[in-house]
Every structure is written in C-alpha cells, then in structure tokens.
Amino acid sequence: MEETLNQEKMVEEIAKRIREILEILGENPDREGLRETPLRVARALLEMTSGLRTPQPQIKTFNLSEDGISEVEDQIILVKNIGFSSLCEHHLLPIIGKVHVAYIVGQERKVAGFSKIIRIVNYYASRPQIQERLVQQIADAIMNSDIHPKGVMVIGDALHMCAYVRGVKDREASLLSVATRGLFKNNVSLRNYVFRLLETSKKTSLL
C-alpha cells in the first residue's frame, strides 16, 4: 500500500513539473489536447525508469546434465533480436534497438531461462542510459549469475532519437556496441563465430 502511495505521489510531483515545462515553452496545459499530458508523461517516465526502483531479476538456471543431455559444456547459447527501448541520459530521448546475448556453457552445465535473459536486458534498459554502459551491465549480470558461464558476449544495435530528431537529424545511423567477458574477451575467433551466427540466422530465419 505504501509503495502505491509513493508511486502516486511521484506521478503527482512529476506531472506538476511537466505542466510547468509546457507553460515555459509557451503552451497552455489546460487546453483539451494537453489537459492529461502531464499525467501521461509522468506515468511514462516512471515506467521507462522502473529499473532504478526495482531489484535486479534473478536468472533461473537449468542443469542440462540432470536432463541426460551430454556434451553441453562449452556449447554457445545465443539469444538474438531482443528488442529494447531506453532513455538517452544526455537528452532523455528514446534509444530503440536490439540486443543479442551469447554465452558459453560452463563446467556446471547450467543454462539460463530464456525469458530471464530478456528480463535482464529490459531491467538495465529501464533507466537513463548510454548504450555502451548498457551492454556492459548486461554482460556483467550474466557473467556473475548462477549459470557461471565461461564467457559472455553482448551486442547492442540501436537508433538514438537524440541524433534522429535533433542536432544532425540523421535517419540512418545506428550505434553498435559490444561487451565481452571470459573466453570471449581475448578470443577473436569466438567473437567472429557469434557474428557469423547472427549473419547466417538473418538469411535462414523463418520469421
């Protein structure tokens, strides 16, 4: 109950300031089209920054050796095309793109729940961010998780609205950022293998 009250108070306080910003810009926040805008913006901002106020999701693990699956150690698992949106911390404008996560199964032969990787991406995206930090945080979270992988590689590819709608107004440029941990760190062949997997999957995808 207290958390709900705090949330409502935050919405109220943010909405007040959005209303003030509209007035400073020369708008009338009482006109029909803008009457509910401060509340809508407040709720949207709270949703897009929810990672600041919630604990990191736990990564559920599955031990494949217990399921009779042999030769799983050293297998590369790739979760690709994880759509995400975040807020550029410099302009508070959207970053929209995809993240690909690869990891090498460790000696304990544990793998991560599919949806849990997606939740980790969304968790670190739900805050003011820069893409370079985002991929690092995702990589660290998975590398330090209970699956104990031998290596992690995270690739982010996104459009940044701060360059799309203002400044240079470039509609085509995207930012590619890569974070590596463990065996991926110093092994170019492993990194290239992941890039080849992504390229091959584009040509053979059923979706």
From Swiss-Prot:
Ligand binding (Zn(2+)): 88, 91, 162
GO cellular component: cytoplasm
Enzyme Commission number(s): 3.5.4.16
Listed GO biological process terms: one-carbon metabolic process; tetrahydrobiopterin biosynthetic process; tetrahydrofolate biosynthetic process
NCBIfam families noted in UniProt: PRK09347.1-2 (NF006825), PRK09347.1-3 (NF006826)
Family: Belongs to the GTP cyclohydrolase I family.
PANTHER family in alphabetical order: GTP CYCLOHYDROLASE 1 (PTHR11109:SF7), GTP CYCLOHYDROLASE I (PTHR11109)
Record's protein name: GTP cyclohydrolase 1
Organism the protein comes from: Sulfurisphaera tokodaii (strain DSM 16993 / JCM 10545 / NBRC 100140 / 7)
Record gene name: folE
